[in-house]
Amino acid sequence: MEDDQELERKISGLKTSMAEGERKTALEMVQAAGTDRQCVTFVLHEEDHTLGNCLRYIIMKNPEVEFCGYTTTHPSESKINLRIQTRGALPAVEPFQKGLNELLNVCQHVLVKFEASIKDYKAKKASKKEPTF
């Protein structure tokens, strides 16, 4: 129970700036009345298919996850609803957090490889005295 309260504190601390200067939470946790912690919808504001599909793919690789899907509410709104349902007693928050961390690791790995490739490319061009892009 304390983990849920800690997560709520963290979630409420995530803010995104709005056009009129007002602040709005970047992440909401929606749970229908009478449901358990294993089935939760996360509303991510200011996000789209880029994050939604990547996160869905990574979360579904977890064998404890029974269902993970996302929808965009409307093309003119930049928010997604990510629904996670787990097997057993695992709260849906855990695969969500793990998925975000794994996605961050993948992105960092891609960035490191990309920057190394650019550095190698420029070094080869410099040694041949060819102009780079």
From Swiss-Prot:
One of its GO terms (biological process) is DNA-templated transcription. One of its GO terms (cellular component) is nucleoplasm. The modification N-acetylmethionine is found at M1. The keyword Disulfide bond does not apply. Its main location: nucleus. Gene3D superfamilies: RNA polymerase, RBP11-like subunit. Belongs to the archaeal Rpo11/eukaryotic RPB11/RPC19 RNA polymerase subunit family. PANTHER family: DNA-DIRECTED RNA POLYMERASE I,II,III, DNA-DIRECTED RNA POLYMERASES I AND III SUBUNIT RPAC2. This is DNA-directed RNA polymerases I and III subunit RPAC2. It comes from Mus musculus (Mouse).
